[in-house]
């Protein structure tokens, strides 16, 4: 479909995005979901490749208000393990960036400034609310997902949605996952690397049912941390974000690999933020452990990196050489443009970062900028 960007202050030429707009409950949405995904790269009138941000967040203020009386911060590692100064800085950030988090018109201006055509928008990471009792968790998940669907329906040429599900109860999680995809037209879900401190492979959670359904529906799973759950040593200097976030992703991903989730459910489309945590750059140690120790081989029969290579990684490295190393190891086809918008630990110039990566071929650049994300998210011509 053709459209002229009407975002106030946008000086770009008209864009061209030919993909299906997903609208809640419409016959057109049902037909669109059945159409095959085009392998062609979507381009705008300037001829450049589509740019898709896989890592960006929206704060649902109604959901936050509904749970405010329960004091959510006592359950959130990012707040629980934070110094007084860190909490003060975070409060100011939430005030200063309130419009960016929840006002779409402001977001659109920033997207145009950053050169982003489409956001795969996901909830603010704390809005998974795994600490709630299951019924309440399911109710709040529906609130969050319904709002994301409304945003996509109103601006279908700029957004696709990644929802949330109550992983504290796998039956309710599977029900909401199906609703997200089949009724709301969302393209995937955001999860945390643990469920209120329990590993994703914890037998009591029985999350194989969730992963099986995600594979069946062929959706994206975006696994985003909210600080490290044992963050006592990381309270000062914002270390529970700087170190704790990539650490929690590293631990959660390692359990998915060593616990056999990736082996039992081949074809899962899991995206790791912050360039995959520490595994993206220190992967060899897990392979050595697998070769050296029988307790690393109790479930999986192949080296851990053979599974790690099936994950997708965003570009948030803040350094062209680090991003080059990630691409060298896992391939440009596994790396996706990400910003962590609108938080202060995000990448303000994602296009500039990718363009500054040495020895990057044009075809690789296109994959990272949006080609692969468009395929994963079923963004159609």
Where are these regions (language model features)?
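Hydrophobic faces of well-ordered beta-strands that scaffold small-molecule active sites
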Residues: 52-56, 119-121, 160-163, 189-191, ...
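Catalytic metal-binding/acid-base residues of hydrolase active sites
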Residues: 57, 226-227, 276, 342
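Short acidic/glycine-rich loop or secondary-structure boundary segments that cap or lie
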Residues: 61, 231, 279-283, 288, ...
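Aromatic- and acidic-residue-enriched segments that line the glycan-binding/catalytic groove
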Residues: 63-76, 135-139, 177, 207, ...
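Active-site gating/metal-coordination segments in enzymes
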Residues: 117-259
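A general structural motif
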Residues: 250-253, 292-297, 315-319
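Aromatic-lined glycan-binding groove of carbohydrate-active enzymes
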Residues: 260-308
């Amino acid at each position: 479909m053709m459209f002229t960007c009407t975002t106030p202050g946008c000086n770009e030429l008209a864009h061209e995005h030919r993909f299906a707009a997903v609208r809640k409950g419409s016959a057109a949405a049902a037909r669109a979901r059945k159409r095959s995904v085009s392998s062609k790269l979507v381009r705008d009138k300037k001829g450049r490749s589509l740019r898709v941000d896989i890592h960006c967040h929206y704060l649902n203020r109604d959901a936050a208000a509904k749970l405010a009386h329960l004091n959510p911060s006592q359950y959130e590692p990012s707040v629980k393990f934070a110094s007084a100064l860190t909490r003060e800085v975070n409060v100011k950030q939430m005030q200063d960036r309130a419009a960016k988090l929840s006002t779409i018109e402001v977001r659109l201006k920033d997207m145009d400034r950053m050169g982003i055509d489409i956001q795969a928008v996901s909830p603010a990471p704390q809005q998974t609310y795994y600490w709630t009792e299951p019924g309440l968790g399911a109710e709040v998940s529906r609130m969050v997902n319904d709002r994301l669907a409304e945003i996509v329906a109103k601006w279908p040429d700029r957004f696709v949605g990644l929802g949330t599900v109550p992983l504290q109860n796998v039956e309710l999680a599977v029900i909401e996952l199906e609703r997200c995809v089949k009724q709301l037209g969302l393209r995937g879900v955001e999860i945390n690397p643990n469920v209120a401190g329990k590993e994703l492979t914890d037998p009591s959670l029985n999350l194989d049912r969730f992963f099986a359904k995600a594979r069946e529906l062929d959706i994206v799973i975006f696994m985003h941390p909210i600080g490290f759950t044992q963050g006592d040593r990381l309270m000062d200097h914002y270390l529970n974000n700087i170190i704790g976030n990539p650490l929690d992703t590293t631990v959660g991903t390692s359990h998915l690999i060593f616990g056999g989730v990736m082996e039992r459910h081949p074809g899962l489309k899991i995206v790791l933020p912050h360039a995959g945590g520490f595994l993206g750059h220190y992967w060899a140690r897990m392979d050595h452990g697998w070769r050296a120790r029988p307790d690393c081989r109790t479930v999986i029969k192949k080296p851990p990196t053979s599974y790690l290579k099936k994950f997708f990684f965003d570009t948030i490295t803040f350094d062209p050489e680090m991003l080059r190393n990630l691409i060298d190891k896992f391939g440009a086809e596994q790396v996706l443009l990400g910003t962590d918008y609108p938080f202060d630990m995000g990448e303000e110039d994602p296009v500039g970062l990718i363009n500054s990566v040495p020895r990057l071929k044009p075809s690789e650049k296109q994959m990272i900028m949006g080609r692969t994300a468009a395929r994963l998210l079923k963004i159609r011509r």
